[in-house]
Structures are given as C-alpha cells and as structure tokens.
Amino acid sequence: MHIVIFVLLAFVAGMLLHRQLVRTREAKVTAMPPPLSSYEASVTTATFTTMVLETSTDKPVLVDFYAAWCRPCHYLGPVLAEMAKNYKGNFLLAKVDVDAEPSLANTYSIKSMPTVLLFRDGRRVAEFVGARQEHSVRFFLAQNGVLPPAEEAADV
C-alpha cells in the first residue's frame, strides 16, 4: 500500500515539475528581452533574426557572445557598452548569454568567450575572440567601416 502511494506521489510531483518546465520554456521563447540601452540589446534565439540579421541591413550589429562565469567577458562587456553609447547608434550592440542560448552559440560555432561577431546585411563579416582594450575594438570597428560620430572621429 505504501509503495502505491509513493508511486502516485512521485507521478504527481513529476507532472507538476514538467508543467513548470514547460511554462518556463514558453516564457523564454515568447518574452522579448528589454533593451539594455538604446544602443544595446539582450538577444535570444527567438529574437536573433529580427534584432541581429534584419537590423544589420540598416546598420552594423556587433554581437557579444558572453558567459556570466567568464572573467574576460566581465572586462570586455563594459568596454563594448561604453563604445556603443559613444558611437551613438552607429552600431547596435547585441548581447548573447551562451549558457542561456546554447543553440545560438552552436549555430555560430562559438568555442571561446568572449567572442564578438560583426554583422552587415544579414551576414557575419568579421569577428574577434578574447577581451580587448577600447583602442583595439575601435580599430576593429574602423577596419570594418564602423566609425564614431563626426565629433569623435577626429580623436580616433
């Protein structure tokens, strides 16, 4: 009798857990992440096409693949965010958490973090791996035709 009750309770607990996992997964897929700033956005598998591929037909999109546990990511992230702000919309900074979006990381063969990809016209056109100082990221952007606003261009 105790075994039957135990099996029944285990079954009910499993069903409740399954329902919660399904709800969590649905919430992740349907929820559009809020922009981090007007020049920066958090991107998911569900929003990648719109926020990266389609946006890159109007302006360059710099995609930062990062992980919360990655120390170099903690250095590069603020550098990229500050540059996105300083470039005043000349590119969009899209951030992808590889732990939350493993299929997206796999699609773009992300093996190390941070990895930064540059998209134009819906295509990946350039990339770099590892943390860089601001001047190095500026050079990378300039090499790929992404320039700061006119008032800052003289300082580059």
What kind of feature is each model-predicted range?
Residues K111-S112, L117-D155:
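Non-catalytic, surface beta->alpha helical segment in thiol-disulfide oxidoreductase systems
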Residues A94-N106, H135:
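Structural microenvironment flanking redox-active thiols in thiol-disulfide oxidoreductases
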Residues E40-V61:
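A short beta-strand-turn-helix
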Residues L62-V63, L93, V116:
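Hydrophobic beta-strand anchors of alpha/beta hydrolase catalytic cores
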Residues K59-V61, Y66-W69, S112:
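Short pre-active-site segment immediately N-terminal to redox-active cysteine/selenocysteine motifs
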Residues M1-S38, V156:
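N-terminal targeting signals for export/organelle localization
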Residues P72-K88:
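Typically the conserved alpha-helix immediately C-terminal to a functionally engaged Cys/Sec
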